[in-house]
Amino acid sequence: MNLPEHFLVTGGAGFIGSYLVERLLADGKAVTVIDDLSTGSLDNLQAVIANPNLRVIESKVSECRALSEIVAESESIYHLAAAVGVELVVNSPIRTIQTNLRETEVVLEAASRYGVPILLTSTSEVYGKSQKPAFSEEDDLLIGPPHLGRWSYACSKLMDEFLAMAFVRERKLPVTIARLFNTVGPRQTGKYGMVLPRFVAAAGAGQPLKVYGDGSQTRCFCYVSDTVEALLRLKRTSAAVGEVVNVGSEEQISVLDLAHRVVSLMNSSSSIELVPYDVALAPGFEDMRNRRPSIEKLWRLTGFRPSHHLDEIIALVAGQPIKKGAPQGAP
């Protein structure tokens, strides 16, 4: 009997990682998850935890004694383990930097030892203070000063990218880097500052939706199944090796309009409050004013574009049907 292909997913008990694990198992693969459960949860894997092709190891990647053995038997690696969420980054910059750098270095070394291809997830945060209407993978990057801890996440993930590309050049390791833009969906928690689950939870409870700053900052939200599909396609595409590729939706909305949209679609009585960044997060906090990807490279390499629109995403996160008569795209 042929054994199923084996994949390692670091951070596989996290929000995105758990959906990726489910998809790999559904495709008949065997999966090992390494996750320290610092921001992930076994609850995210509840639907597949009894699957005989799934093995879960509760550990940091850097402290996993079986890492070499696991990597050696893996067809590919998806490295998603990282510090996540703006509030965690602001409050724990040391943890953020150490987690992102150490875990990535260790998994790249292990992958290089056995020549196992790896897909590394990065972040749109690396675009920093760019004022371009759409971010391209070839753009110069402008990140804020080191005394503002909020940039520690962007800087550490950018160093992950540099390190990964060094492994491509010096050790010929097949690495693909996916820069993710605001992936959302059920299971995502607002605990660490993620905006859409915060808004949906507040609207569902009839509590005020707290918008940081003046709400004019814009974002593009990509549904988690679209993100997972993009990751799988990139991993299967040989032309994506050694490349950085944006993964996200191009449907843009201001955070204030998002709050109004959530209230409207959920038929909520909640009010909307503007909260200064200094109060909500940290003194001197600098936000990215706009965050919209160019996904032409993703389309060129994989033939894939996200298919879920924002109103549908909000309804899926809220766990309810879209309100009748609410036009797509209306605030």
Could you tell me what each predicted segment is?
Residues 107, 167, 199-202, 230-234:
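A short, amphipathic alpha-helix embedded in the catalytic core of nucleotide-handling enzymes
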Residues 1-181, 225, 326, 330-331:
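N-terminal Rossmann-like NAD(P)+-binding domain of SDR-like oxidoreductases, especially those catalyzing
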Residues 159, 163, 167, 199, ...:
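Hydrophobic alpha-helix immediately C-terminal to the catalytic Tyr-X-X-X-Lys motif of short-chain
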Residues 13-16, 42, 87, 130, ...:
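Gly/Ser/Thr-rich beta-alpha loop segments that engage phosphate groups in nucleotides
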Residues 86-90, 185-186, 280-284:
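A short acidic, helix-capping loop that chelates divalent metal ions and anchors anionic groups
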Residues 50, 63, 131, 188-192, ...:
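Residue-level signature of the cytosolic catalytic core of signaling kinases
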Residues 44-46, 130-133, 188-191, 224, ...:
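Short aromatic-enriched loop/helix-cap "lid" or pocket-rim segments at secondary-structure transitions
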Residues 7, 182, 203-331:
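C-terminal substrate-binding subdomain of Rossmann-fold SDR/epimerase-dehydratase oxidoreductases
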